[in-house]
Amino acid sequence: QSTAYWNNDGLDVTDSRNVRITNCFINATDDGICLKSENPKSICENIYIDSNIVRSSASGFKLGTAGHGGFRNITVRNLTGFDTYRSAIALESVDGGVLEDIDIRGVRAYNTGNAIFLRRGHRNVGGPVGTLKRVHISDVVAEIPLLKPDQGYPIEGPPDHLNPGFDRMPIRPSHFHLYGHPFLPYNLIPSSIVGLPGFPVEDVVIENVEINYGGGGHRSVAHIPLEDLGRVPENRANYPEFSMFGELPAWGFYLRHARGIQFRNVKLSFKKDDYRPAVTMDDVQSSSFSALKIPTARELPVVFLHETKEISFTGLETVFPLTEAVKRVNNAIR
């Protein structure tokens, strides 16, 4: 239990090798289980995490934010998360280190702000860009609500429009921290895999994953036209967080600057209608999507591809025929 201060992680492992974390219950006001790498000459490596339950006012399982040396050979099994403000799974490579050979299977995330967030960024301006590749995430079930997931806990996660450590934190952020509130002018945020121009996220498998969103996205709250995806900021050096880009032009999954992505048996659904595509890809290459199920789509396109190459779909299930459901623009080819 680590709940005395808003910045308290549950369990931090820093620049360590050959570690096992099993059968723990963690309640934290910041990240639940968090691996960090503060030393460019060291690394978190050969770490096994199994059969843990996490409640977090930040992210449930996270690699980062500090990733100077990096992370390699990290295995996660049978993770349950609930009432988690940010992401169930957050893998962040932003400080020049490696993030490679990550294997995550068996995640149940209930009442969590986001399911999956992968980010290759460049916070260490002037230094090398780190790697983010060879990631396997499978057997995941996640429920994403419309309202702040950790509302009512003694110390809630800080609202995105305030700067922790500088701005005064309200006693009850959830009193105003609702999607669509003027302080947060964006709709419910999708899972995302986002790299940088010329530095893509590489070789990621998302398999046997089911994410059910609250939905409710409306143009009156925020709208990024599909013909103007450049309005989504790169935020190259910003602190990595699933909400770092603000409004995104998808309700289920957003992929940008990525290569070698494989979706296998992924189901995306919402409870309330959302006007955005379920999946939007921008600068994605050499990727395949098999048995992608989107049963609740209401508007076209269901999947939108911009500046993509060598993208294939097998067994796409939606209420619309494939020829209508998938829209490709610019140099997109099948």
Language model regions located:
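Extracellular/periplasmic carbohydrate-active domains that bind, remodel
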Residues: 1-334
